Amino acid sequence: GNYRTEMWSQNSNFFKENPLFVNKGISVQTPPQMLERFYDDVVLEGSNTVIILAGINDIAQNTGPISINQIANNIFQMSKIASDNNIEVFICSVLPANKILWNKKIKPTYKVIKLNQILKIYCLKNNIKYIDYYSSMVDWSGGLKAPEYTSIWDLVHPNKLGYKKMEEVLMNEIKKEL
């Protein structure tokens, strides 16, 4: 994961209370950067399950322009590495965003929806679990609900209640698999 994932540990006790979950989020990383460290972080660490949450920093063009298909392909490559090593994969939807305050020229709403559609179809075709954070956290404008799940000065990163909602969605999906 990226900053959203990294900050989960700062805004919640979820990882302390669930020590089988390891947070590997690194601030501002994009899927290509995550892919570079994926084998070491997931396979060599001996994981039996991986939860992939990625894409918003590419949509924000943090490392330059990239197509939605390229973003998805990087996530698919991580999924394939895990599957090839008998690691169960969960792919998460990208959280809603209708503004990227650090790159105001980007209009993310449609791109988030499109990427989520591609990810969901991939999961269905490949028998991979899809964690749909988007549906539970989106507002009328296609953004992350503010002030419920993000601050009005951010609009991209979850607040404490946002992380609580993510935990609820995640644990409900995991319980379905048990």
Residue ranges of predicted features:
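Structural recognition of the beta-strand scaffold that forms the well-ordered cores
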Residues: 21-25, 49-53, 89-93, 129-132, ...
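Catalytic His-Asp segment of secreted/periplasmic serine-dependent ester chemistry enzymes
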Residues: 95-178
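Short C-terminal domain-edge/linker segments immediately following a structured domain
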Residues: 27-33, 51-57, 81-85, 120-123, ...
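Alpha-helical scaffolding segments of alpha/beta enzyme cores, especially the outer helices
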Residues: 70-80, 84, 114-121
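Active-site segments of SGNH/GDSL-like serine hydrolases
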Residues: 53-59, 79-113
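Conserved SGNH/GDSL esterase-like catalytic core that processes O-acyl groups on lipids
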Residues: 1-77
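Sec-exported extracytoplasmic/periplasmic mature domains
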Residues: 39, 43, 55, 80-87, ...
